[in-house]
Design a protein with these regions (language model features):
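Short non-domain terminal segments
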Residues: 6-7, 27
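Bacterial N-terminal signal peptides
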Residues: 7-15
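Intrinsic-disorder/low-complexity detector
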Residues: 18-176
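Positively charged n-region of N-terminal signal peptides that target proteins for export
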Residues: 1-4
Length: 176
């Protein structure tokens, strides 16, 4: 009887251990290097990516260090663009600015606020500008910018890809 129980226990343990590696593809922040979003290069809309990257670098330069929760920040931005945030922005701002949050929670909601502000600014260029933007590419631009800032290797204003993409967005949204 003890032998049967032992064999059953070992079989369950082996099955459980083998499925843990499979779970990393379903659980956020496990497995891959880019844990939040990792679009293929051919799936990235240059104008959306570049504008988000440039705005994020301009906003967060000298504010991101190696301990900043970049994945949480990008997850907050991603959740905003996916429509997962049901709490009004004003309420998030009020709670965030009163303090008392753990760094990871603060980073997440900062990402939500950054994404909302970026979307609002796109809409200020023209009423239909946001419809011309690819939100996954925006999220990728935000995420890459935050990761680059964390490593001190952000792309500059003179980067051809970023410059051309930003110009493309201005033309698409303002017609100039």
């Amino acid at each position: 009887m003890l032998k049967k129980i032992s064999i059953f226990f070992v079989a369950v343990m082996l099955a459980g251990c083998s499925s843990i590696s499979d779970m990393t593809s379903y659980i956020p922040f496990m497995g891959k290097d880019k844990k939040v979003i990792n679009l293929d290069k051919d799936k990235i809309d240059q104008k959306s990516y570049a504008a988000a990257y440039e705005a994020t670098v301009a906003t967060y330069k000298d504010r991101v260090n190696k301990n900043f929760f970049v994945d949480n920040f990008a997850s907050g931005a991603n959740d905003w663009y996916l429509g997962r945030i049901v709490v009004p922005i004003k309420q998030i701002q009020d709670k965030l600015y009163t303090g008392g949050h753990d760094s990871d929670v603060y980073a997440y909601y900062s990402g939500v606020l950054h994404a909302e502000a970026l979307q609002t600014n796109f809409s200020r260029l023209s009423a239909n500008c946001w419809q011309k933007v690819d939100s996954p590419s925006v999220t990728q631009g935000i995420y890459d910018a935050m990761r680059d800032l964390q490593q001190g290797k952000e792309r500059g204003e003179n980067d051809a890809y970023i410059f051309q993409g930003s110009e493309m967005l201005l033309k698409a949204c303002t017609g100039q």
